């Protein structure tokens, strides 16, 4: 559905777009893909290899915006009212006397995230098989709904269950029938499942970059595709408008500064879908500008603000209402930059005189929470190595690059696959990228990026002196990599 134009045709210089990409790189952001469009005309599209145009990106909480529109479509069909009490739609799942606050909670409250509940850590409670049942029975309500905004991801999952109950279809199948089949998008997309088989609608849509951008464009275009009004325009305007204030800090942080609609963030003069780790789709209807980006910046303080600051400085401030004269040389330079993008590796020196001393030495670990009992390093060449270690699962090897990523399978098994919160088995492993740098002569820092249906990362800092080693591993990942977080003291054998 998209066409491609030069930045100059879009009203911005190719050099400004190149500076935008370069500044994000300089800021150390771990991005996977980026797209900029004026309406349905793309003027910048890039992928950090191994990601490409066909890659399915985990959107995390951007998924909520899809579920929110699905709820609105069901309301338009007359299958629900936004002012319905949520408890009236799930009598079969309620096994307690309904608390007063919960009895007053409506679908609209949930769309706006003004619920009566706190967001539960359902991952940790293995008995939380049916998240809707868990939400309605196990979480104590503590405030009147409709008064205070607080992020409630679990409530979004309940709304997903409602979509599937009332439509009789999977969330994505329903949206395909209503929207995406007509647009020719989301043909390869899918949604992971919760433990009981419901679509994981608050977190787990996987789709291409153009897919998610097309959804942003549809809402920016008032729900109209070609001559067909796929979503009533009034409904779109209601969904993307500021329904409630959501500034919890008083500092006006990027997405808490302006407001919240129906599972859609409102800020500046536009709206956004926002997902963990740097998944963003931002639309500015007044300027006909669309921006989508994916990545894994979990654990990077201020990543969203950095991305938006770069967008403001190099795109929004430079964008003109009329086309600019073509600049073939600058455009060629931009295309060269975009085609050369590689998944970021950890920066730092790739050589140390200590490397030969460390090579092959076995370290015996003191008792630690990660159950790593021993480790060693093997350096196969000047720019590659292997982290060898033994933990509760047995002996493992993790190849890594120096000054580059090495791609492979992360050796820990038992993490979730199609069903969130359930093990994928002992023969299922996530794709990963690993790199290392010598930050000091006797300090090696290893970074591992999980680049699969689930995104996560960890840093491991290995400091050596006088036959001893101190190791600090710090992970950022939702419900996995728990075995890679803590401290180790070790001695050379």
What is the role of each PLM region?
Residues 2-6, 10-11, 15-25, 52-63, ...:
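Active-site-proximal loop and beta-strand segments within enzyme catalytic domains
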């Amino acid at each position: 559905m998209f066409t491609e134009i030069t930045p100059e045709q879009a009203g911005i210089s190719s050099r400004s777009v190149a500076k935008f990409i370069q500044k994000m790189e300089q800021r150390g952001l771990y991005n996977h893909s980026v797209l900029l469009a004026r309406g349905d005309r793309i003027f910048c599209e890039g992928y950090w290899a191994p990601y490409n145009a066909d890659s399915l990106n985990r959107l995390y909480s951007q998924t909520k915006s899809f579920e929110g529109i699905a709820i609105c479509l069901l309301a338009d069909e007359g299958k629900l009212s936004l002012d319905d009490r949520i408890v009236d739609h799930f009598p079969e799942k309620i096994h307690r006397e309904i608390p007063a606050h919960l009895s007053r909670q409506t679908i609209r409250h949930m769309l706006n995230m003004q619920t009566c509940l706190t967001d539960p850590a359902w991952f940790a409670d293995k008995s939380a098989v049916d998240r809707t049942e868990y939400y309605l029975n196990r979480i104590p309500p503590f405030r009147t709904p409709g008064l205070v905004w607080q992020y409630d991801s679990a409530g979004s999952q309940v709304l997903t269950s409602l979509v599937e109950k009332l439509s009789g279809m999977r969330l994505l199948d329903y949206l395909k029938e209503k929207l995406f089949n007509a647009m020719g998008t989301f043909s390869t997309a899918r949604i992971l499942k919760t433990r009981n088989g419901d679509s994981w609608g608050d977190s787990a849509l996987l789709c291409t970059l153009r897919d998610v951008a097309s959804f942003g464009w549809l809402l920016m275009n008032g729900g109209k595709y070609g001559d067909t009004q796929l979503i009533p325009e009034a409904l779109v305007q209601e969904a993307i408008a500021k329904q409630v204030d959501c500034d919890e800090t008083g500092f006006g942080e990027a997405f808490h500064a302006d407001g919240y609609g129906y599972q859609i963030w409102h800020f500046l003069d536009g709206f956004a879908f926002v997902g963990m780790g740097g998944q963003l789709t931002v639309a500015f209807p007044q300027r006909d500008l669309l921006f989508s980006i994916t990545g894994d910046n979990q654990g990077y303080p201020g990543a969203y603000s950095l991305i938006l600051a770069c967008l403001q400085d190099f795109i929004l401030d430079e964008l003109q209402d009329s086309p600019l004269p073509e600049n073939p040389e600058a455009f060629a330079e931009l295309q060269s930059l975009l085609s050369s993008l590689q998944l970021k590796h950890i920066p730092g020196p790739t050589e140390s005189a200590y490397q030969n001393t460390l090579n092959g030495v076995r370290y015996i670990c003191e008792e630690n929470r990660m159950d790593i009992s021993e480790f060693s390093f093997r350096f196969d060449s000047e720019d590659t190595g292997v982290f060898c270690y033994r933990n509760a699962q047995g002996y493992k090897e993790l190849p890594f690059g120096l000054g580059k990523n090495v791609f492979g399978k992360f050796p820990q098994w038992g993490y979730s696959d199609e069903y969130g919160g359930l093990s994928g088995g002992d023969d299922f492993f996530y794709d990963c990228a690993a790199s290392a740098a010598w930050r000091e002569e006797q300090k090696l820092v290893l970074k591992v990026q999980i680049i699969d249906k689930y995104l996560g990362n960890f840093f491991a800092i290995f400091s050596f002196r006088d036959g001893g080693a101190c190791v600090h591993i710090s992970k950022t990942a939702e419900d996995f990599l728990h075995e890679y977080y803590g401290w180790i003291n070790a001695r050379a054998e």
